[in-house]
A protein has these predicted regions:
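Bacterial Sec-dependent N-terminal signal peptides
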Residues: 1-24
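Active-site mouth of glycoside hydrolases
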Residues: 25-295, 301-328, 334-434
Length: 435
């Protein structure tokens, strides 16, 4: 009997020891995370090619502009190309009927929302989640095409925002430069941030803060100070906004949406200041050779080499900063016009394809060598749209070009087979960086 008891105790002891030695299994986070200067997703390195799909929430709605069947086809086509990262506008602000602004609007007046668009955003996130795609959602805009700065300033009592197509961009930028210092405008925006981030998806039942289909909250699309005097108030506002987002959501990444030094009055020190903030998880840069005067309407082909030289210099400067800060970099906007500055889908894209290949190559080379580049989003996906007017009109299909731009200027359509082939090649190359 004594021997049996001793044997039983021995077995129990061995069992306890065996269980004690088993390592605790930690389930990888379903959210995209930033670790040691790189992205991780589901515990694995995450490198990607994505696109800009600003109109996704509108397309996902069942009201004006909604087309859920098209949305599903576009998501399926993008996923088949290997694209799993979409940069999307949460919603536009202000009055409708403005030629250069996208509609329908989400926020008609501060705190007054178009529930149809919110349902569209819910639906979009649900369908992206089904396809293991992730969204970068931007909450504001310095430019007129979705309201943004101008909308909040108007409702803060600063007067009517000039329309760039009527008064010119100088008048517009002078007006919106007041945003950086306008506390009342900030408070209106902060309430919007709280309302959006605290939402629960009506289709999935998931709180937005718990939804892995969201990769990042982005403060705005190309936020700028717009004047030398506004630079420090601008930095202060970004710090406040990122701290607010962090207090509301501990799961998701936070980004600024900046163009880089170009969006900081060409002040690299200011860009470093805003990216150094503890709540900013990764850096963004944009590249627009035509918009920035590196390439010109009549000499696109001739200006190609200079555009590439300027592009590489711009990228290198920002990669040096990323290395110092140990933060990932995403080239989240870049584009180039079609050959001959044509807006027609029938036109060729030889120079654009070459520019895409060049930018993708710089991103891939850096990522494959262990650098800070983590991904890129080309601008923008036009998909199956067939524009019927050069100037967007209500009822026209949405393209990658918002209402203030000629339809077809920067869009990549499903029929652009040569561009899509370039994208497919680079999806595979950049995606291999973490393997």
């Amino acid at each position: 009997m004594k021997r049996i008891v001793i044997l039983m105790l021995a077995v129990v002891s061995l069992s306890i020891l065996a269980n004690a030695k088993k390592p605790k299994v930690v389930k990888p986070s379903p959210f995209v995370q930033m670790k040691s200067g790189h992205f991780e997703r589901a515990g694995k390195p995450y490198y990607y090619v994505g696109t800009n799909f600003w109109y996704g929430a509108i397309l996902g709605s069942e009201g004006q502009g909604g087309d859920r069947q098209r949305l599903l086809r576009e998501l399926d086509n993008l996923k088949a190309m290997g694209i799993d990262n979409l940069r999307i506008l949460v919603g536009s602000d202000g009055e409708q009927g403005v030629t250069t602004k996208v509609e329908p609007t989400l926020q008609k007046a501060p705190g007054v929302y178009n529930d149809t668009i919110l349902a569209g955003l819910d639906y979009l996130l649900m369908e992206m989640g089904k396809r293991q795609m992730v969204a970068v959602l931007y909450l504001n805009n310095s430019w007129e095409w979705s309201g943004g700065y101008g909308f909040y300033l108007e409702h803060a009592g600063e007067g009517k925002a000039p329309r760039p197509n009527e008064a010119g961009y100088t008048a517009f930028m002078n007006f919106v430069s007041k945003y950086a210092s306008c506390e009342k405008a900030h408070q209106l925006f902060y309430q919007y941030v709280k309302d959006i981030i605290s939402r629960t998806n009506r289709y999935t039942g998931l709180k937005y803060t718990d939804d892995p289909a969201i990769m990042s909250w982005q403060i705005g699309n190309e936020p700028r100070a717009f004047s030398q005097e506004a630079k420090q108030p601008f930095a202060k506002w970004l710090a406040e906004a990122s701290a607010l987002i962090r207090s509301l959501d501990k799961n998701h990444l936070i980004s600024i949406g900046s163009e880089g030094s170009w969006g900081c009055e060409n002040d690299m020190a200011l860009y470093e200041q805003i990216c150094s903030d503890v709540n900013i998880d990764y850096m963004n840069i944009h590249l627009w050779p035509y918009n920035w005067g590196w390439a010109h309407e009549r000499t696109l082909r001739k200006d190609f080499e200079q555009s590439c030289r300027n592009t590489k210099q711009y990228i290198d400067e920002h990669l040096q900063l990323a290395s110092r800060l140990s933060k990932p970099v995403v080239m989240e906007e870049f584009g180039f016009p079609r050959d001959g500055f044509s807006f027609s889908q029938e036109s060729t894209t030889t120079v654009r394809d070459a520019y895409y290949r060049f930018v993708f190559g710089l991103v891939a080379d850096n990522a494959l060598s262990g650098g800070n580049f983590a991904g890129c989003n080309f601008w923008g996906w036009g998909g199956e749209a067939n524009p019927t007017h050069q100037q967007w009109q209500v009822g026209d299909p949405y393209t990658g070009d918002p209402a203030q731009e000629a339809q077809g200027l920067n869009s990549v359509f499903s029929t652009d087979t040569t561009t899509i082939q370039v994208i497919r090649e680079q999806v595979e190359r950049i995606g291999s960086a973490g393997k």
